[in-house]
Amino acid sequence: VESFNGRPMLFINGEPTTEFWCYGDPGAIEDFVSAGIRICQFHVPFPSWWTGPEQYDFGPTDEKIEEFCARAGSVLLMPRVNFGYVGEEWWGDSHPDELAVGLDPDGKPVDYRQVRSLPVGCWFSSGSQEWTRDAARAMHAFVTHCEERFGDRILGYQIGGGISAEWFRWWYFVEDVYEDYSPAAREAFRRYLRNRYGDDMALRRAWNRPDVCLATAEVPSPRKLRQPAECYFRDPAIERDVVDWLECLSEANAGQIMTLAKVAKEACRWQKLVGTFYGYLWPHWNTRSPARAGHMALRRILNEKAIDFISSPYHYDNRHLGGFHHSQTVPQTIERAGKLHLDEIDTSTHLAKPPRIAGRSCGLPRNAEESCRLLRRDAASVLGTAGTGWWMDLYNDRWYADLEIQAEIRRLQRLAVQSREWDCDSHAELAVVVDDRSSAWCHPTSSLNQFFTSVARQMEWSDLGFPLDTLTAWEVGRYGRARVYLFLNCWFMDGDLRREIIQRVRRPGVTSVWFHGCGFIEKNRCDVANVTELVGIRMRYLPEPALPEIELIPGSDPVVEDAYTPRSFGARLSDDRTDRMLDGPAAHWDAARTPRFAVDDPQARVIGRYVGGREPALAIVEKQGWRSVFCGAPMLPGWLLARLARRSGVHAYTSPGAQVFHRGPLISVYKPQAGLLRVEAPAGMLIQPLMFAETQQVWRPDPRTKPCASVETPFEASETRFYVACDSSGRELPMGAAGNRSAE
């Protein structure tokens, strides 16, 4: 992976490429090769090839690779090497103290074999140095074998472990059980504390406990992990031990990934790709806490030279027909760190066989035409954010065994290949800001973790008619160039980060929207004064837990005039939206209570109050050319956000109701509902529709339409259209007509 045209790009034999990949088994490889795909990821067969201490059976893996080669002579392969699954029971049997231990809220051990939902054989502790050492030897042996026998056919290796091979900790999906209470985890925690604090006195000051010692510190109890002291928030004065443990869990998890990645790189002499799943910061119902998952150490992963790419499936909520495609990780952050993001496009086509589908059945495509519309929407999202992706035959049921689908994939492959020649600058003027570390400072299972992040994005903010960028909180000071920032879950903010963000947003022309308790927690205390400092509006703390909901005040500001109904919003799902969420316990959605924050500033213009009370909960203040908005509840309505964005100078490409991406010269517009739509170019630019020239197999500006400031086009339901932007002189930007034909 090297930089090319301003972004990290995959090089194969010295040639840069931006092509899509696929995932599947040999039985489906012809479906993808027919569609112009030449890179295929596949699962290494179970039971595990790692059969004993430095004992390996590569036979089934060899047979699978040989079958790929026989069916598709030019395919390049990416084995997905997963640790901990069936066939590795022998390791746990001989190292019982190195397995992750889960306890229920009463501190009673739970038998993992009775609650596991996947064929897990060895649920190794993230703190196990013995497992890491042995697995590293096995990883080296696997890569060495593959390179010696199939080196010219292997593109690289994806390393998996934990639940779903996505490095979720083993107990993460088990309701109301907490980890890790194994001897290995306890010793790892003590090592972490020694590295962090150095001596007992520093530890005692941090934990505010005179009796604690580095040599005897224990993993916090399940009850402490389960319930924060401040209902939703953790108090650093009395819960620093909990946060230290959760940070240790992620650090150890990342450490195992990094060790295996380095060994794999060494075994292939740094000539092949190595990547992993990681950084899932956008939760759904059973991934509610990156802290519990072990996914808070993204910065460490991004700094590891042995890791070339990071991948994740796209989000499972509201993803089918009429829904939207967004990553579960942070693709732009990954790209800014110089690594590839690989989007796992596990879209269910009309050939999927219920219940073997990805996500809920609501909105499944009924035919090839609807399948193609979903896949084009997916491609638009990937090309409009960062990196590339693989088309996934998730259950090896041949979801792509359709000539219409294969023709569409070939068209999208050509567009991806052509994009190699384009610059990659994002034209988004609104950025949503998420924070991985803050997940350690809040309730691990509250639905508020979703409401303040992914539910709002998936349900309210996707189709506002302008593109969105994503930043992590620690990137705002360096990369923030937006007109509008939405700070979603930035509960914890230390002094340096706080100063960087304030310096970035307190500038003329910048609007910042702060949700709930952004900045409430710092290193040593929870304090409403922290919120006041960050938001720039004087705030008051309401300690009584309540459901955060806001009712708009008619006539309070032009931005809420002629407000859409309902006039209230917050941590509550309507029935039609529940149908578009990934399945989960209904009771989960009723657990969204939290202390709240009220505006107490005469200079602020209050436009909304909490439902069930009169406390000001939504307010705007304008000072020295910058604007700050406090919003005490999640799910700020999309129409209201669109109005705030327009007031702040954000260019609207379309009216609300369409999802827009604009990266380099490529503009994509996806419209869930059928209807006429006008697409308007940003100031100083012209746009022209793109069309696919079948005879040349290339995307071209439509010769029937000249570059112009706006284009009006009828859209079918769930249709995506592509446009190319050029400067106001009409000078055509490079379309990469030559492309990389080797990708086909």
Task: Cite the ranges covered by each PLM segment.
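Polysaccharide-binding and catalytic clefts of secreted carbohydrate-active enzymes
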Residues: 93-309, 313-316, 324
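A conserved amphipathic helix/loop scaffold
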Residues: 371, 488-744
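Hydrophobic targeting/anchoring helices
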Residues: 270, 275-456, 462-463, 541-593, ...
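The substrate-binding groove and active-site-proximal loops of carbohydrate-active enzymes
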Residues: 16-23, 43-59, 115-137, 236-255, ...
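N-terminal carbohydrate-binding accessory modules
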Residues: 1-36, 418-421
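A short, well-structured beta->alpha microelement
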Residues: 22-29, 295-301, 459-479
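Hydrophobic faces of well-ordered beta-strands that scaffold small-molecule active sites
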Residues: 18-22, 40-42, 77-81, 155-159, ...
